[in-house]
Amino acid sequence: MIWIMTMARRMNGVYAAFMLVAFMMGVAGALQAPTLSLFLSREVGAQPFWIGLFYTVNAIAGIGVSLWLAKRSDSQGDRRKLIIFCCLMAIGNALLFAFNRHYLTLITCGVLLASLANTAMPQLFALAREYADNSAREVVMFSSVMRAQLSLAWVIGPPLAFMLALNYGFTVMFSIAAGIFTLSLVLIAFMLPSVARVELPSENALSMQGGWQDSNVRMLFVASTLMWTCNTMYIIDMPLWISSELGLPDKLAGFLMGTAAGLEIPAMILAGYYVKRYGKRRMMVIAVAAGVLFYTGLIFFNSRMALMTLQLFNAVFIGIVAGIGMLWFQDLMPGRAGAATTLFTNSISTGVILAGVIQGAIAQSWGHFAVYWVIAVISVVALFLTAKVKDV
């Protein structure tokens, strides 16, 4: 427990503010995301095709806007002011969904606001990285603990979202999300620092100009995209699979997701502690190997107890990838924390787009069980690519 004491000694008001903002913004996001399809179906009256189109347009718009803002944030301006602007957009987006039920308005104005709002989280992590670097603090552990706040938010957020939406209505739920974003904005404005741009030494000039030109960055992006494709295919398909083919209760899906999210927290923190000893590549290879075991296990072990037990491998997979994966991008792109963090989050968005298409096609043609064979194969490819990225 020495590392916990060390972290406690190094914690100060600014660090605590980073943690609280990450948690609050995570809860606000976790209130909206799990219930979006239900909202579009019941409140807006959208058919399945239009619901899927909404997700696709939202993801594509998010990638474009976040890359544009990331490039600007790394080269000019105050990153903290950009986060405040994104929070304002998040408030507007939540209020739009609270009081509007027109599909065309939501897929245009709503998607635009959401794509701007979703940039807040990668920019928050980029600001945290720059602050930790400038204050000579432990970057990896701090980032891991901060990322764990998002997992904690996702333990709390989805059950709370369904409780609010089903008992009090979507207007109340989205209004509460807007209120949480407002509190986050106040904390960001008064507690988080503005970090001055650091002039990079000349030997890092190529890294500043490059990024995507680096084959290691490209390979890590593809590997990360495949990892999140696997995770999203599982999240989309699992609730349908356990009820329609395994004959297990619907509520088990919630328990499985909650168990995995809870176990991710210690996995993230332990990964942050051990990464200096073993290196980022080895930790990521261990994580993706755990993912391969998880998805392969789903093919052969389908009982309720087996599914719960397998969540340990799922937690190791997502917990390490979500924390160390982002830091690996940042270390491969020195001086471009915003672009690197956004590239990581865009690998998640790209994975979501691919997962929706692949899962839908496979499940429609060959059934839910075939989905997990495809996921297992994709995870093996991700493991191979991860092992080929250089360690930094």
UniProtKB/Swiss-Prot annotation:
Origin: domain of life:
Bacteria
The protein's matches in SUPFAM superfamilies, at most eight in alphabetical order, are given as: MFS general substrate transporter
- InterPro entries assigned to the protein according to its UniProt record, in alphabetical order: MFS, MFS_dom, MFS_trans_sf, Sugar_efflux
* Molecular function as annotated in GO: carbohydrate:proton symporter activity
Q: What is the recorded name of this protein?
A: Sugar efflux transporter A
Q: Name one GO cellular component term.
A: membrane
Entry-linked Pfam families: MFS_1 (PF07690)
Periplasmic side, ranges: 32-48, 103-106, 171, 241-251, 304-308, 364-365
Instruction: Specify whether Mitochondrion is a keyword of the entry.
Output: no
Q: Which UniProt keywords apply?
A: Cell inner membrane, Cell membrane, Membrane, Sugar transport, Transmembrane, Transmembrane helix, Transport
Q: Is-annotated flag, keyword Membrane?
A: yes
Q: What job does the chain carry out?
A: Involved in the efflux of sugars. The physiological role may be the detoxification of non-metabolizable sugar analogs. Can transport IPTG, lactose and glucose. Has broad substrate specificity, with preferences for glucosides or galactosides with alkyl or aryl substituents.
Which segments cross the bilayer? 11-31, 49-69, 82-102, 107-127, 150-170, 172-192, 220-240, 252-272, 283-303, 309-329, 343-363, 366-386
Organism expressing this protein natively: Escherichia coli (strain K12)
Q: Coiled-coil stretches, from where to where?
A: none
Its GO biological process annotations read:
carbohydrate transmembrane transport; cellular response to glucose-phosphate stress; D-glucose transmembrane transport; lactose transport
The subcellular localization recorded is: Cell inner membrane
Report the sequence similarity comment from the record. Answer: Belongs to the major facilitator superfamily. Set transporter family.
Position of the signal peptide: none
Topology in the membrane?
A: Multi-pass membrane protein
Main site of residence? Answer: membrane
Q: What is the lineage of its organism?
A: Bacteria, Pseudomonadati, Pseudomonadota, Gammaproteobacteria, Enterobacterales
The residues on the Cytoplasmic side of the membrane are 1-10, 70-81, 128-149, 193-219, 273-282, 330-342, 387-392
